[in-house]
Amino acid sequence: MYWEDEKDENTPYVVPDDVVDLVYRINCRSLPLDHAHSFSTAIRDHLSWIDEEERAGIHLIHGAESGNGWMRPDDASNELLHLSHRSRMTLRVPKHRIEDAHTLSGRKLDIDGHSLEVGKANVKLFSTLPTQFARYVVVPEGLGQEDEEAFMAYAVEQLRELGINVRKLLCGRGHAIRHPDGDVHTRSLMLADLDVEEAVTLQQRGIGEHRAMG
């Protein structure tokens, strides 16, 4: 016999802490706008275990997309990202690696000639908001980088494998990230109308490759 009790809607959902975000203070004036590969390499030089952890990830550092007349340029090859004292660096790590990741505090990283000093980190649990946004989801090999419909079908398949019921999915603009082996093509994705468990699962497991590059 199989018997599943209904959920108690009055019981508050507790966000699990088996995977968390570590949000670091940083001291850095500027970075190359396209810093994905060099930043990832610098982090992994100190935290080599990241490649062994399926649920670990490195978030890219972002300034404002727009503001004061400045728009993030499409050609990032010679552009700089100017950072403020409020800028932060975020790593996604499993719980058993939190202490290991704290050893990054106090280090100075060289990101293509730009110095980044890593400060203290705070643990941040995942969001339960029904709308989640990913800036960069890698377009898999075999899909045309301009084929939005094929990419959407790929994303839906990946999400369903995670047990996520896709209700509203919006595909955004494409973006190429420089890599020594050739550009990595990505697209942004927004999911809406997620329930809390789906929102957390999506952040825990994610979709796409190159999570150590943002």
Which residues make up each language-model segment?
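RNA-interacting cores
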Residues: 1-214
